[in-house]
Design a protein with these regions (language model features):
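Glycine-rich phosphate-binding loop of ATP-dependent small-molecule kinases
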Residues: 1-208
Length: 208
């Protein structure tokens, strides 16, 4: 789904429900930025311009993570794959066991821009605010840190992110769309309803 569709929020909820690790490329990349290493500074510049990280770099980061012992019973990928080459690489990972369930969260461009303009992030742990209560009190549910506007919330950056999404990520729908494990969910619903819709879709796929 597009930026602002609620992928991160749903990923946290689903990982807790299924008791599997939530593997967020965003979290891994933010840790690199915080380290202020050469790699971190490169990542920071790309994120702030609204671009996407190089396929080879992010694919290697994910591949190494999926070699961990905690993914044996399943895992939830958040932020990967974003491009067809990344998806092709994921299909080739030797660590995968069983079919991938792919969920697309659909949201209109108008709703995307509205949500992204209001996005907040924790200044301490880097987690996105997940609901209106967090935003109202400007406090992170996870660590109690202060919420601040995201660095990529400027209007031109938002438009750049949408253009990147249309150019590089939309083709993933064509790549995965014909698979029986592909699900599409309306992201304009209330958060709880989106979660319920995803769970129903996943149950239907697993029953096949």
């Amino acid at each position: 789904g597009p930026p602002g569709a609620g992928k991160g929020t749903q990923a946290v909820r689903l990982a807790r429900t299924f008791r599997i690790p939530h593997i967020s490329t965003g979290t891994m990349l933010r840790e690199a930025v915080k380290s202020d290493s050469d790699l971190g500074r490169q990542v920071k510049a790309i994120i702030e311009s609204g671009g996407l990280i190089d396929d080879a770099l992010i694919t290697e980061v994910v591949r190494r993570r999926l070699e961990g012992p905690d993914v044996v019973d399943g895992f939830l990928l958040d932020g990967f794959p974003r491009t067809v080459p990344q998806a092709e690489a994921l299909d080739g990972f030797s660590t995968l066991q069983g079919p991938l369930v792919i969920v697309e969260i659909v949201l209109s461009e108008a709703d995307v821009l509205r949500r992204l303009a209001a996005r907040m992030i924790c200044s301490e742990c880097g987690t996105n605010a997940q609901d209106d209560v967090e935003v109202e009190f400007a406090t992170c549910h996870d660590c109690g840190g202060a919420l601040v506007p995201r660095a990529d919330a400027a209007e031109q950056v938002l438009k750049n992110r949408l253009e990147v999404y249309r150019r590089q990520t939309v083709p993933l729908v064509e790549y995965y769309g014909g698979r029986p494990t592909f699900c599409r969910v309306d992201g304009a619903q209330f958060v709880d309803r989106v979660t319920e819709s995803i769970l129903n879709s996943v149950d239907a796929v697993r029953a096949c």
